[in-house]
Amino acid sequence: ITGLSTRRRIEKGIGHIPEEYMIGVVPDFSVADNLVLDKYFEEPFAHRWGLDHKAVERFAREMIPQYNIRTPSKDTPAIHLSGGNLQKLILAREISHHPRLLIANLPTHGLDVGAAEFIQNQLLALKLEKCAILLISEDLDEIMSVSDRIAVLYEGRITGMVPAADAVKDRLGAWMAGVKL
């Protein structure tokens, strides 16, 4: 997938939540424009002369409350949002494509408890919709609550793999430190 353009990845049903939320947005663009960054070529947003701004506005009005994005306005530049609200914005944009695979790299890292819980609940809901989720996380509680199967990497190698139902924190921690059990 590394050789594919962003547009081709979307067309193939792949979504991505980056490790750093500022990488996932254009800081000076509005919340509304960031929600449709990857939809400019799709109906109803594509317009003969650019974006259909009314369609963008309708979409933003729907997504902002649905994903609990706390913003003064849809026109607020993304740079003025908290990390948790930026992450919810990115999640809303990525989920709106109904991906078959979502790569979530540290999706709750550095977020407050409320925002982290919201993100985890959205991932669980997405999982129920039969979306495969590749969760990359250092939070054992998050890993154990969201995952069906857990693989631990250490220095680029899998040191252990276990169904989440059989996972034990001590064993996972040992694998994370490179200990082979």
What function would you assign to each model-found segment?
Residues 1-181:
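Glycine-rich phosphate-binding loops of nucleotide-dependent enzymes
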